[in-house]
């Protein structure tokens, strides 16, 4: 293959795939809200598809693909458990594990060997404190990549009182905090307070989660190391239509080309708050 350099600055405009960071949070918030939510067509990826599979396995109404995704309306169908393939998606594994902790039943989440080696224990400790059972299912091999087969979660009983506050170590990943924020408002009228122990990694992603929750009527706040969510999800009276924001990460190489060549490259829909 021959690659020829640009001889002069160029102009281009194109659509980027959907941001998996925003899409995964929006899908879970939409499912918990019970509202009818339609997501406008956008390029999907394996991470978003893994969250869709997980929501369907939990009994939520979710359908569609590249032509648009529809979630809800109504409560989830009763189901006592499922085995969910998260593929390579660390966000899906962590968010779906938190959602599994909220739902009665026994859930097994699995994926690639590399996925199951990623940090998870700080989130598992917090989910146990909320009343869920979480354990690692050992694999049959002796190699590091074969020592974990899957994660097993038994959801907490809806009748069991939930603690008002949990502690969390989030210096390894802000996804631990985002996962708890997504489910916290559904634990009861008082919601949930999350006390961070140590620094927070990539706090912008936690703030993205808070903004998304507020779109669905959940109050999310941060005061120093204490994060809180209150007010349960409220179904919108009318169907919601949401455009999935494009992925800043996918624009990175084009931004470099634009800077190096003096070209003008546009990708509509990029939100500076998501970058």
What are these regions (language model features)?
Residues 1-275:
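Short, structured segments at the rim of ligand-binding sites
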């Amino acid at each position: 293959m021959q690659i020829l350099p640009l001889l002069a600055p160029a102009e281009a405009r194109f659509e980027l795939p959907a941001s998996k960071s925003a899409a995964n949070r929006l899908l879970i918030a939409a499912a918990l809200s019970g509202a009818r939510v339609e997501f406008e067509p956008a390029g999907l990826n394996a991470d978003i598809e893994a969250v869709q599979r997980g929501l369907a396995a939990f009994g939520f109404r979710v359908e569609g693909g590249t032509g648009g995704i529809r979630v809800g309306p109504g409560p989830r169908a009763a189901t006592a458990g499922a085995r969910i393939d998260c593929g390579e998606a660390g966000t899906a594994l962590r968010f779906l594990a938190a959602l599994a902790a909220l739902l009665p039943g026994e859930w097994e989440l699995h994926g690639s060997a590399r996925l199951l080696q990623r940090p998870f224990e700080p989130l598992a400790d917090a989910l146990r404190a909320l009343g869920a059972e979480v354990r690692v299912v050992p694999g049959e091999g002796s190699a590091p990549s074969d020592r974990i087969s899957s994660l097993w979660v038994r959801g907490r009983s809806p009748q069991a009182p939930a603690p008002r506050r949990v502690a969390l170590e989030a210096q390894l990943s802000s996804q631990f905090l985002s996962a708890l924020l997504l489910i916290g408002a559904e634990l009861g009228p008082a919601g949930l307070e999350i006390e961070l122990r140590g620094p927070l990694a990539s706090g912008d992603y936690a703030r993205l989660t808070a903004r998304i929750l507020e779109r669905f009527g959940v109050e999310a706040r941060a005061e120093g190391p204490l994060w809180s969510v209150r007010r349960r999800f409220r179904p919108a009276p009318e169907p919601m239509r949401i455009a999935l924001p494009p992925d800043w990460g996918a624009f990175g190489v084009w931004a470099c080309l634009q800077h190096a060549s003096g070209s003008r490259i546009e990708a509509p829909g990029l939100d500076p708050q998501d970058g």
